[in-house]
Amino acid sequence: QKRAEEGVGGRPNRWKWECEQFRDYVLFMSNTGLRPDEAARLEFRDVTIVQDWDTQETILEIEVRGKRGTGYCKSTAEAVDVFRRLSARQRKRQEPGPTDPIFPGGTPRELMNNVLGELNLKFDREGCRRTCYSLRHTYICTRLMNGADIYQIAKNCRTSVEMIEKFYAAHLKTTLDASAINVRKSTKLTFRNGSDTLPAQAPAALSS
């Protein structure tokens, strides 16, 4: 964000476009869960801004084209303004066509690596290297920690529940709902002749 606003080398407009584009790449990826190769193939015709019936939020519906074929993704509401900025930024240069790539520079691997290096964030707590793919991990972990259904996450990310459980098991404990696990079937009581031991919908043999 700071680099996008201030530019590089004391020149406010130097690399401004690239820095703003990178910032929105990070936000877009962490709010859609796309793989880097899927985002690199993404064209403007693949993304539609819609009103979601279930949540009544404005979101993105994305037709994802990857090595695994074509799938579909629904973004978070936060991705909408990001997409609008990406589209507007393209128009400043040239009106984007339906088949133009949303990220014309492809996957910003080198820039991501440089930024992570500057922030001393190249490796996570387990010593694994962070990459652009880590933004997909961010999306999945955030959804899990906010209580989203793991089956719906798997479907939206075009993967399996088994894969999510394998790679994100450490985060699954935060999704366990104690109220759902420790559920007790409630018994409705009715008072009859001073007794409170009969259920409200007792069998006919007991209530006769």
Per-region residue spans from a language model:
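C-terminal secondary-structure termini that scaffold catalytic or DNA-interacting sites
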Residues: 2-6, 12, 51-52, 70, ...
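The DNA-recognition helices of helix-turn-helix-type DNA-binding domains
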Residues: 46, 90, 119, 147, ...
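Active-site/catalytic core of tyrosine-dependent DNA strand-transfer enzymes
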Residues: 1-11, 21-22, 75-127, 133, ...
